[in-house]
Each structure stands twice: as structure tokens, then as C-alpha cells.
Amino acid sequence: MAGILTKIFGDGNQKQLKRLEKQVDLIEQLEPEMEKLEDIDFKNKTEEFKTRYKNGESLNDLLIEVYALVREASKRVLGMRPFRTQLLGAIALHEGNISEMKTGEGKTLASTMPAYLNALTDEGVHIITVNDYLAERDAKDNGLLFDFLGITVGFNHNGLSKDEKREAYLADITYGTNNEFGFDYLRDNMVLYKEQMVQRPLNFAIIDEVDSILIDEARTPLIISGSAKKSAALYQQADGFVRTLNKENDYTYDEKTKGVQLTEEGINKAENYFSIENLFDLDHVSLTHHINQALKAHVSMHRDTDYMVEEDEVVIIDQFTGRKMKGRRYSDGLHQAIEAKEGLQIQNESMTLASITFQNYFRMYNKLSGMTGTAKTEEEEFRNIYNMDVIAIPTNLPIAREDRADLIYKSMEGKFRAVVENIKERYENGQPVLVGTVAVETSELISKLLKRAGVKHEVLNAKNHFREADIIEHAGQRGSVTIATNMAGRGTDIKLGDGVKELGGLAVIGTERHESRRIDNQLRGRSGRQGDPGISQFFLSMEDELMRRFGSDNLKSMMERLGMDDSQPIESKMVSRAVESAQKRVEGNNFDARKTILSYDDVLREQREIIYKQRFEVIDDNSDLREIIENMIQSSIERVVATHTQDSDEENWNLEAIIEYSNGNLFDPDTIHTDDLKDKEANEITELLMKKVKEKYDAKEQELTPEQFREFEKVILLRTVDSKWMDHIDQMDQLRQGIHLRAYGQNDPLREYQMEGFSMFEEMVANIEDEVAKYIMKAQIRENLQRQEVVKNTQAVSGGEDSGKKKTKKPVVKSNTVKRNDPCPCGSGKKYKNCHGQ
């Protein structure tokens, strides 16, 4: 059916490529002209392009000339002439799309053209990679090219000071990891002084390995957290209790959803163990939560698959890359439950101070593009969520790799035996082999079996990823055998050594299907780069997780009926189709989960944007805060007056409450009396109180210099907004955790979350207004001239292994220097030199 439709309407990808091909022809026509340029002319051309852009020409108008210039510069500086296919990919990137370019097709070089073109606007270009090694390598290599063209390059990484970061962001093109860019955005919105901000407005980003960042890590929020004080004892008690349970009677485990819950017998055991009557009483909410997390830690979280223990710490393993995610912690107490399970010291739960998902961070850029070898399977998601088309760029040379059908064995033991035999045979012939595994423990098991078989090999998994680039670089040499977990080592080419092509190229062996077809395709794609020969094949067993979760029981019983032993595999199209449809189902489920998370995160995104915008107004030196603060005080007064003057009969108005509020929160005692408010309308009461507020405000302003009083206003606003916002994030997180229970009451959880989230936000805004009113009118000015962070020690935590280092925020604090003849800040009225300046 799809084939018929393609014939009638044409293939969308082919149409796009035809359009791009016409532009590539025009670029190629300019090659002779560009070859005539002297080296010195290239920098002059850059200035010429910038002037033309400022004079009204668009980047699209300049594209043909610009790409021809960069191509010529690349020939001279790097000794590489971009192929036509790289030009196709480069145009697609400029248009804000995803270029699907296979491994070894030169994505890095293709990215230099749109990066240079968009840098001409002087608004900055960010090139984002999955790790610091790749970012630094590309910044250094491509930096030579950009320097030749008169364009500056920055490398943004974890170890930089604020000033160095600011410098990196001020460069025309900035390289760095997704984590670092996201954290800088959050940290910029926690600074106390505008001068401490490092990022410019987000203009254009090119994301390398875009599927890894926008799909695999889309559900991973970037979090800046501070520690919350909670007792470790309850985790240990819950852990002790869970150890007494047996899986036959006390709990159920759903392997598909990884959900664990107590049975009726388990609940009775819990009530007896903790000497309580009803586990589900409101008084025991915390206990129930701790028991659930302990259950999850013991039943669904597996050591060396989901996490590993290193230096007495629980380190999460990324399920997609197999890398260690140092510094990242499971939320909601699960990490502490695993620490209790492993007998480690339980660390404090953290309180979220600021967070954002990659989905929402990258959607803030004016234009976004990306490149990867595997994106077509997630085309719908890229289009729906990021408004990006996936354009599959043809390879420069035809793919010569042979992708063989899957071999399915009855048991894991039989599968691994066959894998080792296959590797040994190839090893003895000198053919290099890359073995892909899904879990760390599988890579270690195969390593053990290969040692026994006398096969020399390298292992690349979460435990030794620091040697990643080195191991991958040598994986194509004669006689080399490399075991890699989940295609760690993306971004580094496997080049074939001498004589390897004659042996059939690199052999890729998959030991298990991943739940995502894309990850399987990435593994296959390591072989057969740039027209090289190669083979790929997956060895599966009926005991593999994907086969267990979605495979057919009929198949296993058929193998048994036929009397097939472990040495006889099935090579069946039917099984391969069943595996693929299982993968499609999982991908669909994961897409739905990411869409749901985005819908929930959008609620917080809107609120975050409002707060961050207001916060920027506070730290921006040009803003008039008095007007903002007076509006806040007026809102606070109007709320109080409205609450106590609702009755249509004025006799029933509670004027005493208004007086108590006014004298307690705004003025000195006995400032407002009943006679002041009697016989006045509600709006007249508000007007009277606001008149008094302005009088007191004027008087307070006289106590200090205008600069010092503006600083006092900023101190109060920042402290109030930050503390209330952080509490609000925490409350929204708790609301999010429990909202799914509303589905039992036939309510849409998302709709409920939106409504409750909105009312909680309004309540937070009211609390901010009330507190600002109180502090501005009642606080002692001299004690409030130093801006302070609400939480001292903060830590940036995310799904990437590069962000694990603790970062203690040390703001550059401006000192408010008081001149000798200024009024003393203590409020005495004397000159500083005659008071505290002696």
C-alpha cells in the first residue's frame, strides 16, 4: 500500500533532495571562482558577507556563495573537499532540519558550513555534542578552518570560570555538551547580579547525534538541587522489611511495565512489621512511599544493568549508551532505597531549585537543527515536537555491508556459545570484530568466555569509558576484537586497517536486540563506512528480555516440539518480523511517554518563563522597581480588603482585621485606627492605605542614597521570589507524582495537573506579593543590603556523565562601597566617617 502511495504522490524525501541538488549545482559552479582567491581574501569575504547581511540580504541569499567559500577554505586548511552529499546535509541543517547521514559520511565537516553562515549575524551559533571529548576535538579541528575565515570559536565545558564561560559564549561559534548549555541557562536564572550571566539569547543550535539528545535523553530533566534534610532511618527500616518478603505471595511484579506492588498478604505483613493498623492511613503516606521505593530497588532495579556500585556510591548506567552517569541520582527517594539495599551510607534527598528538560531547553532556540546516522524511525516525533523534518542524505558511495538475518537460539547459553565460536573463527582469520551488548554484565560474561577461548580482546563499557575513543579507533585493525555496551563510542570513526577489506571488513555481532530499532541500526552502522565491505548479524535467544517481554511463547514450544537443541538456531523472517513489531510497540510506548512528559512539563515551562522574565527585570539595572513593588503592595492590600468587606451590609465588615493586617505588615503600630476606615467604600480604604504606603516609602528612601535603596529593593525581591519559586517547584513535583491517582476518579490527570498547577502558581504569586509588601515596609534597611542565595551548596544533576561534578556556586558579590561623606548605612543619620567609618 505504502509503495502505491509513493508512486502516486512521490517520496517526500526525494522531493526535498531534488530541491537541494539544484542548490548544490549552483555551489559547484562557483568552485573555479573561489579557487582564484588569495588566502588573505577569505577574511575579507567574511566582512563583506556581514556587511551585506546588515544591509538587508538574507542568509538564504548568501548561502550559495558562503558554502562555496567554506568548501574552498576546507580544501586549503583541512585538506578535505566536502562531497556533494555533505553539501546536501549542510543545506538541510541551515533550514532547521535533521540531516540523516550514515556513519563515516563526514557530518562534522558538513556542520561547518551552516555554522559559518549563521555566525555572520553576530548572534552566536551553538554546536552541541554528547561529550566533552567530541566537543573539544571538533572545536580544535574546525577552529583552524574558522580562524582562517576570520570567525571566533569557543569551547564551553564544566571546568570554566564565569568569565571564561562568558568569553566562550561571546565567540561566533561555541562548542559544548547538551548538559553544559542547559545548566548554564538554569544557573543564569539563579544569579544575583546581571553581570554574572554567561549566555546570550539562544539563536541557532546544531545538535550532533541529535537522536541521542532529543529522543533518548528527552525525558531526563536537568536539575540544580540543594540537599533537603530527611532521615535515613526510614529507608533502612523499609529495606529491612522488604528483605522479609517472598515473591510467591507477598508482591507482584509486571516485567513489561517494571511495576511492583504488595499483595494483600504483603500489606498484612507490613502492618504487623511496623505495628500499625492500616498501611494506607494518611498518617502513613511517607512509610508507604518508602516501602514502595524499597520494593522497586530490590525487584526491578538490577546491579550492573541499571546501576553499579563504585567507591561506595550508586552510579546509574545509561540504558542507551551504557555509560556511567556519574553525579546523577534517581529522584523521589529511589536512589536512597538502592543505597539501603546495597548497604551503603544513605545520602540526603535533594530539593530541586531549578529544572528543565532537554525538550523545553532546545525549543527555546530561534532555529534548531541536528545530524545523526539514525533518525528516520523517529521522524514523526521530530516533526511533532520540534518542527524538524528528517532528510535522509544518500551516502557518497553505495553501502557494501551485508546485513544478515537474525539467528535465534533456544537458550542464552546456546546463543553465547555460538557467539564465541563465530568470534573465534573470525579472530583466527584476522577479521576485526565489534560485539555489541545491551548490559555491562553481558559484556563481562562474553569477555570471560573469550578469555577461556584464548581470544585477545578489548572491553568498552561504563566501567572504562575513559578509554573509549582510543579503543574505538583501533577496533578496525587486523585481528582486533572489541566488546562495546550499547554503542558507546559514537562520534569516533572505526577506520579499517591494512588488509582488512580483503578479509571482508569489520564484522558487527549483536548479542541482543535493543528495544529501539535505532540503537540496533547504530550498531550495524559502525561497519561499512564510506563504501567499505562489512557484515552485521544479531544472535538472539528466547530468553532475551525483549523476546521474554514481547516474544511468542508458541515459538519456544515449537522449538521444543521439533526437538531443537541449543546448537541449532532458527533463521526465520517470521521471528525477525515479530522482533521488529515488538520494537515498534516499545518505540510507540516511549514516544507516548515523552509526549506525556512534555505536556506536563509545558505547565511548568510557562510558569518558569514568567518567573525568569520577572527575575531578569529585578536584576536588570535599568528597571524601575518602585513601581513594580507598589503594584505588589496594592495587590496584597486589595486581597485583604476584599476578603473582609464581602458582606453587602457595611456593619458586618471586619475593619479590625484590616487594621491588624495594616499595622502588623505595613506600618508602625497604631498608625491606622477604626475612625480612619469608617464610612469608606472598599476602594477608598485601599486608596487610603496606598497613600500611607507611599508616604512611608518616601520616608524610607530618604534613609539611604538612591543606589543603596534600589539595592535594598532588589535584595528583598530576589530573596522572596527565589525562596517561593523553589518551594513551588518542589510542590509541583509532589503534585506530579500523585496526580495519576486522579484517573481512578474518572478525571483526566493532565487536566487536573494544569488546573491545580495554575492555582498553586497564583497562590505563590500572592505569597510573593504579601511577603515583599511586608519586608519592604517593615525590614531594617541596614541589615538588607547584601544579596544572598537562598541555598548555599547547589549541585547540577542530569542524565549525562559529564555533569557529575559538584558545583558550589560562588557568586561574584558586588560590594556596596559607602563613601566617607555618604549617610551611614546603619540608619543613624550621621555621615559614614563620623559613625561606622571611624
Curated annotation (Swiss-Prot):
Zn(2+) binds at C824, C826, C835, H836. One of its GO terms (molecular function) is metal ion binding. Keywords: ATP-binding, Cell membrane, Cytoplasm, Membrane, Metal-binding, Nucleotide-binding, Protein transport, Translocase, Translocation, Transport, Zinc. CDD domains: DEXDc_SecA, SF2_C_secA. Its main location: membrane. One of its GO terms (cellular component) is plasma membrane. InterPro entries: Helicase_ATP-bd, Helicase_C-like, P-loop_NTPase, SEC_C_motif, SecA, SecA_CS, SecA_DEAD, SecA_motor_DEAD. Part of the Sec protein translocase complex. Interacts with the SecYEG preprotein conducting channel. Has a central role in coupling the hydrolysis of ATP to the transfer of proteins into and across the cell membrane, serving as an ATP-driven molecular motor driving the stepwise translocation of polypeptide chains across the membrane. NCBIfam families: PRK09200.1, PRK12904.1, secA. Belongs to the SecA family. This is Protein translocase subunit SecA.
